[in-house]
Amino acid sequence: MKYGASSLAFVSLTAKAQRASPPLGWAESAVPAVSDRDTPPIAAATDAASHLTVAVRIDGKGPYHFVVDTGADRTILATEVADELGLFRGEKVMLEGVVRAVLTETVAIRTMSFGSITCRHRVVPTLSRTLLQADGYLGLDFLDGHRVTFDFKNHTLQVSEPRPRLSASWARENEARISASGSGGHLQALDCVVDGVAATAFIDSGAEVSAANAPLLAALARRNPSFGEMGTIRLIDITGGEIVGKVAMVNKIRFSGLTFNDCPLVIADFLVFGVWGLRQRPALLIGMNLLRQFARVSIDYGLKELRFDLAAYLPPPKPLITMAD
């Protein structure tokens, strides 16, 4: 059995797992999120790779510090935490990282609580805390169906109910709203254009860097013969696998209401593009190096929309982010 995984950083990449079957007789369930007014923002710590981490309780124990990863299909738990809690060991599964796949154990969790939300009867893969650099990763199995707001200005993170559909077309001043499509949490923005090349984009909050796939690189080279790589970089995923990626600079990444200028991208045959069904066409992974330029980023999995708040953005002499014309 194989489970997909992936995420990016300059010195390491982190893996994500797809669904593992629960023990016989278990049924997965979740306590619905309460309304926004009853869901206060949760103070978020920052790990070595500048990801936001939050406190999670497992079977009533903790708190444990988890990276919130919108590119991960499934939640992953550190082996050391599983040992500490004496969790039941399940079947072994093949966990497919960014670079390679490894055989890893699964454990059964009765309750996992984050803020006002509690998930019950989960089976999750495990990896060493040394590789994760955290106690675990919260994936789309936990986040899908909710609205996740990364408030970089106030250093908080909030998981709440989706916006009401009547408010879907409304946006605050200095807020860019982008519609997305997809299912199972795989929200993709289809109106992305990278230096004149149409591409599909998705947000991965577990990725320290932004990345492009080989089809996007090829399309950029065809459009601009002078386009080329600035160099190479070695990346390591959490399974211990290594890959050498190409580093390239693009002039503009444009969405319907937003433009990024002068963006460095890492380009390689990362497995995450295959997991998201984007291996054969130009695709872009938006990582933390771009997200952190905003005051706030919101991903609404119910309404299938992305919102970027520029209210507190202070541009350098040459802006990295501008509102599109």
Predicted segments with their positions:
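Pepsin/retropepsin-fold aspartyl endopeptidases
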Residues: 4-325
